[in-house]
């Protein structure tokens, strides 16, 4: 069974830094598993790795889609599995849990959502609860005032769930070693605040302005981008935008941790441990020795 490694965790937990160290140590190529970092121009607000930070490590499925491109979990599953087969020892990096699970586990997805007649649809509130359970990142970035988007997200997830249950899926297709970088919430919040201030200094507001100016129908139902867009439209102040971004990010991080623990059951590592790199390397060495 092909071996695959993954490093996941909340924003600002140190995934990028650790992944580069591990990739250099074991001569790995990285497959991006952050659904937002796949899009071009969404750089500052997604904390996308820079060329300098990458240190020559090859990255796949990163910064390759034009804003507004329709690229679903179905497309990612196909592309990610192709990259897995092409890469001697792939390293997934990112916090989009459902994307990672769709690539590594035996999910059967199709390009079209299931058609459900209106009489069979649950209430909007129940759809939202279902989405929240299945994909915390999706609910964090979903416009809950838009019933059409809620229905679309619900149908996409329902299709994958029904097909998985019907075919008794959820079995791993690969021999996987998955790490989750855990971090104290108070320290994480301080990091999120610091990162947001850095993003604003780097030009986050201008980035949002440029995207909406030059691309039709860009996706701004994303934590950070949604609030900055509201700021540019004069609906909220900068302080209000910052407060909302921090609040939404922390809420998402909480749901994200619960989802990973329940759905993927990764090896949880202390992101602040001085022995983090050493521990990770030891675990990978042991993993590579097994058949």
From Swiss-Prot:
Keywords linked to the UniProt accession: ATP-binding, Magnesium, Nucleotide-binding, Transferase, tRNA processing
SUPFAM superfamilies, A to Z: P-loop containing nucleoside triphosphate hydrolases (SSF52540)
Region ranges (Interaction with substrate tRNA): 34-37
UniProt record similarity statement: Belongs to the IPP transferase family.
Record site feature (Interaction with substrate tRNA), residues: 96
Highest classification ranks of the organism: Bacteria, Bacillati, Mycoplasmatota, Mollicutes, Acholeplasmatales
Reactions that this protein is recorded to catalyse: adenosine(37) in tRNA + dimethylallyl diphosphate = N(6)-dimethylallyladenosine(37) in tRNA + diphosphate
InterPro entries: Dimethylallyltransferase, IPT, P-loop_NTPase
Top-level division of the source organism's lineage: Bacteria
Cofactor(s) the record lists: Mg(2+)
Molecular function, one GO term: tRNA dimethylallyltransferase activity
Species of provenance: Onion yellows phytoplasma (strain OY-M)
Binding site for substrate: 11-16
A Pfam family recorded for this sequence: IPPT
Assembly notes: Monomer.
Descriptive protein name: tRNA dimethylallyltransferase
EC annotation from Swiss-Prot or TrEMBL: 2.5.1.75
């Amino acid at each position: 069974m092909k071996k695959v490694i993954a490093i996941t965790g909340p924003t600002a937990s140190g995934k990028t830094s650790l992944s580069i160290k591990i990739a250099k140590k074991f001569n790995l190529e990285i497959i991006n598993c952050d659904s937002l970092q796949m899009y071009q121009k969404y750089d500052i607000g997604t904390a996308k790795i820079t060329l300098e930070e990458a240190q020559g490590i090859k990255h796949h499925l990163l910064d390759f889609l034009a804003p507004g491109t329709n690229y679903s979990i179905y497309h990612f599953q196909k592309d990610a599995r192709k990259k897995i087969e092409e890469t001697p020892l792939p390293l997934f990096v990112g916090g989009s849990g459902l994307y990672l699970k769709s690539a590594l586990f035996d999910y059967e997805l199709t390009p079209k959502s299931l058609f459900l007649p209106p009489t069979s649809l649950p209430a909007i509130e129940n759809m939202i609860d279902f989405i929240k359970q299945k994909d915390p990142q999706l609910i964090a970035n979903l416009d809950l005032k838009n019933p059409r988007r809620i229905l679309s997200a619900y149908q996409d997830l329902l299709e994958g769930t029904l097909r998985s249950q019907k075919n008794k899926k959820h079995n791993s297709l690969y021999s996987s070693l998955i790490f989750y970088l855990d971090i104290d919430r108070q320290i994480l919040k301080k990091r999120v605040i610091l990162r947001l201030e850095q993003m604003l200094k780097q030009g986050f507001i201008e980035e949002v302005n440029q995207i909406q100016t030059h691309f039709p129908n860009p996706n701004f139902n994303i934590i950070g981008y949604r609030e900055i867009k509201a700021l540019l439209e004069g609906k909220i102040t900068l302080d209000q935008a910052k407060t909302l971004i921090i609040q939404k990010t922390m809420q998402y991080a909480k749901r994200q941790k619960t989802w990973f623990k329940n759905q993927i059951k990764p090896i949880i590592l202390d992101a602040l441990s001085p022995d983090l790199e050493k521990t990770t390397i030891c675990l990978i060495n042991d993993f590579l020795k097994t058949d």
